């Protein structure tokens, strides 16, 4: 209200459309839009390629045996657990090992020093994913204890490595596991692989996550972005409100 008499200019990369916080309701239609697709075509942003990786338990769901107990000794409710429950309501250790293995496989394909962000369902899963990736990449972890690092709000040691991760000159950390912390406000110009292993509800959050890897740094060998998707989040690329198509998608099971 104080600035109501002034001309107000709004600029955003991910406009909000929440009830009570809708950019279009407040400012009206944008007077100028520069889309992600146009930025890629003009050579300012990195083109991206999607690998959609579907795990059997995600496709078929999982039902515990009658009387089956969890790691804490509590009986698991007998019902069909869908992909949306896994990670949030239910942790399947074998599934996490499969995810870590496939991340490692991709890094062997694209370069094991490719800076990578792994988005997990919560901070506990981010911690276990870090441990699994350390075990599967022990040779490089011997060279640096920060080859795989968890960066979450509650981990002070991990947060200390954030500046090193986003630096174009620091090689470590290489793989970062997180939940929410790195989805916004982090400019990691050399991030070459984004791994999605969490349910993403909103288009805004999806754009923010993809945006962590859309920077170009040709002088550092960053020409494009790889996206490894375990949660079918990249189906949002087909949404008419998303501006920018990926290169051909590959699917694995």
Predicted regions, residues:
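Beta-sheet entry/capping signal
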Residues: 7-9, 47-48, 115-117, 147, ...
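Interdomain helical connector at the RecA1-RecA2 junction of SF1/SF2 helicase-like NTPases
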Residues: 21-114
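Conserved C-terminal RecA-like helicase domain
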Residues: 82-176
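Signature of the SF2 helicase/ATPase Hel1-core->accessory helical subdomain module
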Residues: 1-51, 57, 188, 193-208, ...
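Conserved RecA-like P-loop NTPase helicase motor core
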Residues: 151-248
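Short beta-turn/strand-loop junction motif enriched in small, turn-promoting residues
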Residues: 36, 105, 136-138, 181-183, ...
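Conserved small/polar residues in nucleotide/adenosyl-binding loops
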Residues: 252-253
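Charged, alpha-helix-enriched surfaces in structured cytosolic catalytic cores
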Residues: 31, 35, 45, 94-98, ...
